[in-house]
Amino acid sequence: MFQLLCAVFIGGGTGSVLRWWLGMKLNPVHHAIPIGTLTANLVGAFVIGAGLAWFNRLTDIDPMWKLLITTGFCGGLTTFSTFSAEVVFLLQQGRVSWALLNVMVNLLGSFAMTAVAFWLFSQAASR
């Protein structure tokens, strides 16, 4: 049990640090859309899709790796709370169109990245 806890802890810490770094580097790039948060959410969606596809096919992998990557890393990297706060901030500034675009791109982009990665890695794992 302690090993599993450590796997989630290490993955979560790594994902959180990467999310912070992406925000620091990429959020200033655009005046209205927080590109760092979007990147973190899209990358996390892709990684979890790929991970789930691999873990579905390769059942002999230690469950610790699934926890480290999906629950830990992706859980630390992706962020619904920051995304929500950024949308509220845009709404408070009267930037309704930007807020709606941000919601649409984050949600649809995350769904698409998860589906594409799952499909790609399912195909690769079946070969």
Swiss-Prot record:
Subcellular localization(s) per the UniProt record: Cell inner membrane
In the record, biological process GO terms are: cellular detoxification of fluoride
> Topology versus the membrane, per the UniProt entry?
Multi-pass membrane protein
Q: Which InterPro entries match?
A: FluC
The protein here is known as Fluoride-specific ion channel FluC
Q: Which organism does this record belong to?
A: Klebsiella pneumoniae (strain 342)
Q: Where does Na(+) bind?
A: G75, T78
The UniProt note on how this protein's activity is regulated states: Na(+) is not transported, but it plays an essential structural role and its presence is essential for fluoride channel function.
